[in-house]
């Protein structure tokens, strides 16, 4: 294991019994077929549960819906990117030549995904308790806001609650097109409400952002129809 990975283990306060997991967690799909996306998927769930447990403990009076919104605000890309920078992930992430030349080691989405993959790798290497301890240490310096600004509803949440309040099924989201070069893609996403036969589209720099844009467009349509 090289000095960079040894230093990262020290910052994580975890020495891997299977160092290959850490290497894979830091490997972008542009570098190798043995990349970090499955670990990212796993780490996203581990992170979500660990943060949910932290909020349940610290915000004992907050109702479920508000807890969900505080958690979403905490684990958003901006926060994970900041934490990844603090761990020094730009210095150790493995990128393909084209991605590296285009500045991929600075890209917030790549670094946020790598952090989730590292959390997933720690979970596989040592179990949930150790991964949870890592998440708690990472979020020690992150301000946990429970004010109205922090728990403001994003478009997807607002749309979901609008539909549930009318006993309707949740909307369907589909990526209909991926535009641009691999290192700078935009996602064209459809949002459909089947019962109403409504379909709207939105574009964003990630799938999640595209879904939020499509949900915002759908909310505008619903509010316009309601005002008629």
Swiss-Prot record:
Supply the alphabetized keyword list. Cytoplasm, Endonuclease, Hydrolase, Magnesium, Metal-binding, mRNA processing, Nuclease, RNA-binding, rRNA processing, rRNA-binding, tRNA processing
Q: Which domain of life is it from?
A: Bacteria
* GO biological process terms on file: mRNA processing; regulation of gene expression; rRNA processing; tRNA processing
Q: Where in the numbering of this chain does the RNase III domain appear?
A: 5-127
A Pfam family annotated for this chain is Ribonucleas_3_3
| EC number, UniProt record | 3.1.26.3
What this protein needs as a cofactor is: Mg(2+)
> What PROSITE patterns does the database record attribute to this sequence?
DS_RBD, RNASE_3_1, RNASE_3_2
Give the DRBM domain ranges.
Answer: 154-224
Q: Which residues bind Mg(2+)?
A: 40, 113, 116
Q: Which GO terms describe its cellular component?
A: cytoplasm
Is Transport given among the entry's keywords? Answer: no
Broadest EC class? hydrolase
Q: Give the catalytic activity.
A: Endonucleolytic cleavage to 5'-phosphomonoester
Q: Where in the cell is it found?
A: Cytoplasm
Q: Name one GO molecular function term.
A: double-stranded RNA binding
Principal subcellular localization: cytoplasm
What Gene3D superfamilies does the record point to?
3.30.160.20, Ribonuclease III domain (1.10.1520.10)
In this protein, the active site sits at 44, 116
Q: How does it assemble?
A: Homodimer.
> What function does this protein fulfil?
Digests double-stranded RNA. Involved in the processing of primary rRNA transcript to yield the immediate precursors to the large and small rRNAs (23S and 16S). Processes some mRNAs, and tRNAs when they are encoded in the rRNA operon. Processes pre-crRNA and tracrRNA of type II CRISPR loci if present in the organism.
Recorded family membership? Belongs to the ribonuclease III family.
According to UniProt, the name of this protein is: Ribonuclease 3
* Species annotation: Albidiferax ferrireducens (strain ATCC BAA-621 / DSM 15236 / T118) (Rhodoferax ferrireducens)
Q: What is the lineage of its organism?
A: Bacteria, Pseudomonadati, Pseudomonadota, Betaproteobacteria, Burkholderiales
> In the UniProt record, what gene is named as encoding this protein?
rnc
């Amino acid at each position: 294991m090289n000095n960079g990975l040894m230093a990262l283990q020290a910052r994580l306060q975890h020495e891997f019994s299977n160092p290959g997991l850490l290497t894979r967690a830091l490997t972008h799909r542009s570098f190798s077929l043995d990349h970090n996306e499955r670990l990212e998927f796993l780490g996203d769930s581990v992170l979500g549960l660990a943060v949910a447990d932290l909020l349940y403990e610290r915000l004992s009076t907050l109702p479920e819906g508000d807890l969900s919104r505080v958690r979403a605000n905490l684990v958003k890309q901006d926060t994970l990117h900041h934490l990844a920078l603090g761990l020094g992930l730009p210095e150790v992430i493995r990128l393909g030549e084209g991605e590296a030349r285009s500045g991929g080691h600075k890209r917030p989405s790549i670094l946020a995904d790598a952090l989730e993959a590292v959390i997933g790798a720690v979970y596989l290497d040592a179990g949930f308790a150790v991964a949870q301890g890592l998440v708690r240490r990472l979020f020690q310096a992150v301000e946990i806001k429970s004010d109205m600004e922090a728990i403001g509803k994003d478009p997807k949440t607002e749309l979901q609650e609008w539909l549930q309040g009318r006993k309707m099924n949740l909307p369907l989201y589909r990526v209909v097109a991926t535009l641009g070069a691999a290192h700078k893609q935009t996602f064209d996403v459809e949002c459909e409400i089947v019962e109403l036969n409504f379909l709207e589209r939105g574009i964003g720099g990630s799938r999640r952002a595209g879904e939020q844009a499509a949900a915002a467009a759908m909310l505008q349509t619903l509010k316009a129809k309601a005002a008629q």
